[in-house]
Swiss-Prot record:
Membrane-spanning intervals of the chain: none
Function: May be involved in cooperative interactions with calmodulins or calmodulin-like proteins. Recruits calmodulin proteins to microtubules, thus being a potential scaffold in cellular signaling and trafficking. May associate with nucleic acids and regulate gene expression at the transcriptional or post-transcriptional level.
Taxonomic superkingdom: Eukaryota
Species classification: Eukaryota, Viridiplantae, Streptophyta, Embryophyta, Tracheophyta
Short motif Nuclear localization signal 2, span: 396-403
Protein name: Protein IQ-DOMAIN 3
Residue ranges that the Swiss-Prot or TrEMBL entry lists as coiled coil: 170-224
Subunit structure: Binds to multiple calmodulin (CaM) in the presence of Ca(2+) and CaM-like proteins.
Family: Belongs to the IQD family.
Organism from which the protein derives: Arabidopsis thaliana
Biased composition range(s): Low complexity: 286-295
A Pfam family: IQ
Gene designation: IQD3
Length: 430
């Protein structure tokens, strides 16, 4: 590199290019001379714009060559100055080294140089480590590290958010499960309470319980048969009189054609048991009261009608005896007054019940004692009832076809016996 540069400088400084440049103008002069001759001969025909352009280009080339020559001379001078400076520096170092350690041997100077070299090596090593630390610090505090740190923090944030959502979902599922188990437990407790309400706490055995249920079923069947028998007889009486009590039909069950009393009795099958001792005592007391009233009525009838041996008097007395209010009729009237009116397919204020009440009041007014004298209206009502003895007998039979109360047994033998006794007494009196 240095040799080529130095050779280039020598060529620039050599006189050969000057001679060539000097030779060239001679040739050109010859050529220019010839051309002038030609130009003169040709009288300006060869002169053209092309020659002008060539001249300009040559001038530019000459200027460039001059500039390059001047630059080469300057660089050569600079190189010579640099070489001289280097030689001078070497001489200065040599002289300074000799003058730095005056009065010392070569061995001491060598040791000093070795120490300085080693110290320089250690200093360069420390400098290299320091540069590494600076470079590491720049890397740590650089943009890449910051970008990595931000991405790591974002990923950690998303991970924490996902963990929180999963934990919240688990808590919600556990709460829903607890609520579901609580509802199932409440439902189970309700079912258990319901089964406990229907539990039979009786100390009876299974056979006894089944026997009681069978007896109840048999009793209900007998009761239904008795009611059906009474209903069939009631239909015959209604067909004969055409004035029976009002029955009510159920559109869903056409065979359910009983009166409201029979249906009320059928709706309460467990209350129609046999007579208890209390009911028996009540029945006996009621019979004694009825017989006492009849015994009081008969002698007073003798005093009231001394001329009662005529057929008309017998005719009037016989219906009176038949229309004596018995215990069953009283119970029917009291039951009709106490029965509520809001039962299905029943009308408490029906026409047959009011007619039965009127007949009962008329019969009761005729069987009063002597100190309660009947009025003219009562006598007229009695005469009207005497005109239709057949209907009064049928109404009495109709009342006797039912039981006196829902808790007592039917009695069909009471009123006919009274009627027979009274008729016998009337015949004896006659």
């Amino acid at each position: 590199m240095g040799k080529s540069w130095f050779s280039a400088v020598k060529k620039a400084l050599s006189p050969e290019p000057k001679q060539k440049k000097e030779q060239k103008p001679h040739k050109s002069k010859k050529w220019f001379g010839k051309s002038k001759k030609l130009d003169v001969t040709n009288s300006g025909a060869a002169y053209s714009p092309r020659t002008v352009k060539d001249a300009k280009l040559k001038e530019i080339e000459e200027q460039q060559s001059r500039h390059a020559y001047s630059v080469a001379i300057a660089t050569a001078a600079a190189a010579e100055a640099a070489v001289a400076a280097a030689q001078a520096a070497a001489e200065v170092v040599r002289l300074s080294a000799l003058s730095r350690f005056p009065g010392k041997s070569m061995e001491e100077i060598a040791a000093i140089k070795i120490q300085t070299a080693f110290r320089g090596y250690m200093a360069r090593r420390a400098l290299r480590a320091l540069r590494g630390l600076v470079r590491l610090k720049s890397l740590v505090q650089g943009k890449c590290v910051r970008r990595q740190a931000t991405s790591t923090l974002q990923s950690m944030q998303t991970l924490a958010r996902v963990q929180y959502q999963i934990r919240e979902r688990r808590l919600r599922l556990s709460e829903d499960k607890q609520a579901l188990t609580r509802q199932l437990q409440q439902k189970h407790n309700k079912d258990f309470d319901k089964t406990g309400e229907n539990w039979n706490d009786s100390t009876l055995s299974r056979e006894k319980v089944e026997a009681n249920m069978l007896n109840k079923q048999v009793a209900t069947m007998r009761r239904e048969k008795a009611l059906a028998y009474a209903f069939s007889h009631q239909n015959t009486w209604k067909n004969s009189t055409k004035m029976g009590s009002q029955t009510f039909m159920d559109p869903n069950n056409p065979h359910w054609g009983w009166s409201w009393l029979e249906r009320w009795m059928a709706a309460r099958p467990n209350e129609n048991h046999s007579l208890t001792p209390d009911n028996a005592e009540k029945d006996s007391s009621a019979r004694s009261v009825a017989s006492r009233a009849m015994s009081e009525m008969i002698p007073r009838g003798k005093n009231l009608s001394p001329r009662g041996k005529t057929p008309n008097s017998r005719r009037g007395s016989s219906p009176r005896v038949r229309q004596v209010p018995s215990e069953d009729s009283n119970s029917i009237v009291s039951f009709q007054s106490e029965q509520p009116c809001n039962r299905r397919h029943s009308t408490c204020g029906s026409i047959p019940s009011t007619r039965d009440d009127e007949s009962f009041t008329s019969s009761f007014s005729q069987s009063v004692p002597g100190y309660m004298a009947p009025t003219q209206a009562a006598k007229a009502r009695a005469r009207f009832s005497n005109l239709s003895p057949l209907s009064s007998e049928k109404t009495a039979k109709k009342r006797l076809s039912f039981s006196g109360s829902p808790k007592t047994v039917r009695r069909f033998s009471g009123p006919p016996k009274l009627e027979s006794n009274v008729t016998k007494k009337d015949t004896n009196l006659a």
